[in-house]
Design a protein with these regions (language model features):
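Acidic/His-rich, divalent-metal-binding segments that scaffold phosphate/diphosphate chemistry
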Residues: 152-233
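Divalent metal-dependent catalytic cores for phosphoryl transfer on phosphate-bearing substrates
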Residues: 196-314
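Glycine-rich phosphate-binding loop used to anchor ATP phosphates in small-molecule kinases
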Residues: 54-102
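The conserved Walker
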Residues: 13-14
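Conserved substrate/cofactor phosphate-moiety recognition/catalytic segment
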Residues: 20-74
């Protein structure tokens, strides 16, 4: 039996408009707002008072307040960035004994607009903090424990008009001209992406579009230094799956008619597509079972399929 008590957990980058939307939800559902920014200012006197010690104190108290209100039968809006999977799981575990409908709300605003709007705020966040969250973004998924998903698009249609494969490929600065400069990739990013999409069309055509944009994060993560900070003659794309998952959100919104659940599913497919490149990822049955439990059977199979198409495209 579904509980009448609703929990709205917002997920979004700083300056994406979470707090504004939290107020709308609060009015619509007569919900209590619990904001990490507001509590940080209450406890430490500064929204930018960020440290591990402060965060431990902050989120322990925040979780307690959310849980108390839910137990008292109040609808709650939990307003924090929540872009990290581990933090979302810790929160859900903390409130696991409370009956409520858990709704995960992805607040969508392109990264460059987050940076612009951040500068217009009275209390801004350091730009490097937003960049770090963007480059480590982890999309939520059903197996975390959510009952439903929704997406709140906090911009005009014109703001995401350029998020289309017709623009991504077919202009002078598009990915057809993006040279990957890596020993692992001799093709341009555009050609490689088309090859993966063609292979996916033959294997599972409903994933063709996702295959076409699976590496879109590489545009924003290209670096000539390796993980040790040394130039080694190759370009590297650390975290391109995280950035790609975030950027893909706007391509799906603009180019497809997918509902929120489907968009988030495909974002996860892009986020996880690199897992099978990790050494030993499937060398024991227990590792495979853990990953299937984390993703679900269907997403697991689709991740393996996308990775297979990605590998085969390298070999063509």
């Amino acid at each position: 039996m579904k509980s009448d008590v609703k929990l709205f957990c917002l997920v979004g980058l700083p300056a994406s408009g979470k707090s504004t939307y939290a107020k709308e939800l609060s009015e619509q559902y007569n919900a209590k707002i619990h904001s990490s920014d507001a509590l940080r200012e209450e406890l430490f006197g500064d929204v930018n008072a960020v440290s591990k010690e402060n965060n431990d104190i902050l989120f322990t108290e925040l979780y307690k307040r959310v849980k108390k209100d839910l137990r008292n039968g109040n609808n709650v809006v939990y307003d924090a960035t929540n872009v990290n999977k581990r933090n979302r799981l810790a929160f859900l575990k903390f409130i696991s004994g409370v009956e409520c409908e858990k709704i995960c709300v992805l607040v969508a605003l392109p990264y460059h607009l987050c940076l612009t709007r951040n500068l217009q705020r009275e209390k801004s966040v350091p730009a490097d903090v937003i960049e770090r969250m963007y480059k480590h973004f982890q999309p939520p998924n059903e197996k975390e424990g959510w009952d439903s998903f929704s997406i709140y698009v906090n911009c005009e249609e014109s703001d995401i008009f350029a998020y289309s494969t017709s623009v991504l490929f077919n202009n002078a600065s598009g990915i057809d001209y993006f040279h990957q400069e890596s020993q692992h990739h001799r093709d341009t990013l555009g050609l490689h992406s088309r090859k993966v999409a063609d292979l996916m069309y033959e294997a599972k055509k409903e994933l063709e579009y996702t295959a076409l944009i699976h590496d879109v994060g590489k545009i924003f993560t290209k670096t000539r230094t390796n993980s040790h900070g040394v130039e080694d003659g190759d370009c590297h794309y650390y975290g391109h799956n995280c950035v790609g998952a975030y950027e893909s959100l706007f391509y799906f919104l603009n180019d497809t008619d997918y509902e929120a659940d489907a968009i988030i599913y495909h974002m996860n497919l892009i986020y996880y597509h690199m897992v099978p490149y990790n050494d030993g990822w499937n060398d024991t049955e227990s590792k495979i079972r853990r990953l299937k439990a984390q993703l679900g059977e269907e997403l697991y199979e689709d991740v393996v399929l996308l990775n297979r198409c990605d590998r085969e495209a390298h070999e063509e």
